[in-house]
Amino acid sequence: MIFKVFYQEKLTEVPVRENTKVLYLEATSEKDVRTKLNKFAYNIEFVQSVTGAHLEYEKENADLTLAEIV
């Protein structure tokens, strides 16, 4: 499943909408997403699953590139 993650790059900063970044990640669950991103110390605001028509829209209208976490 593909997830869209809204995050701030620094855990210590107060979230500001204008500084929010997005990445797309393939994972089995929201918990799996958070586990994979844990080592980056991001301030994760929201994790959203992207499926069906929403996934097609993101592919056509957004810069949908799956992040590879090693």
Swiss-Prot record:
Protein's UniProt keywords contain Signal: no
Keywords: DNA-directed RNA polymerase, Nucleotidyltransferase, Transcription, Transferase
The enzyme's E.C. designation: 2.7.7.6
Family annotation (Gene3D superfamilies): RNAP, epsilon subunit-like
Keyword Transferase: yes
Top-level EC class: transferase
Cellular component terms (Gene Ontology): DNA-directed RNA polymerase complex
Gene Ontology BP, a term: DNA-templated transcription
Subunit structure: RNAP is composed of a core of 2 alpha, a beta and a beta' subunit. The core is associated with a delta subunit, and at least one of epsilon or omega. When a sigma factor is associated with the core the holoenzyme is formed, which can initiate transcription.
Sequence similarity: Belongs to the RNA polymerase subunit epsilon family.
Role summary: A non-essential component of RNA polymerase (RNAP).
Name the record gives this protein: DNA-directed RNA polymerase subunit epsilon
Annotated organism of origin: Bacillus cereus (strain ATCC 14579 / DSM 31 / CCUG 7414 / JCM 2152 / NBRC 15305 / NCIMB 9373 / NCTC 2599 / NRRL B-3711)
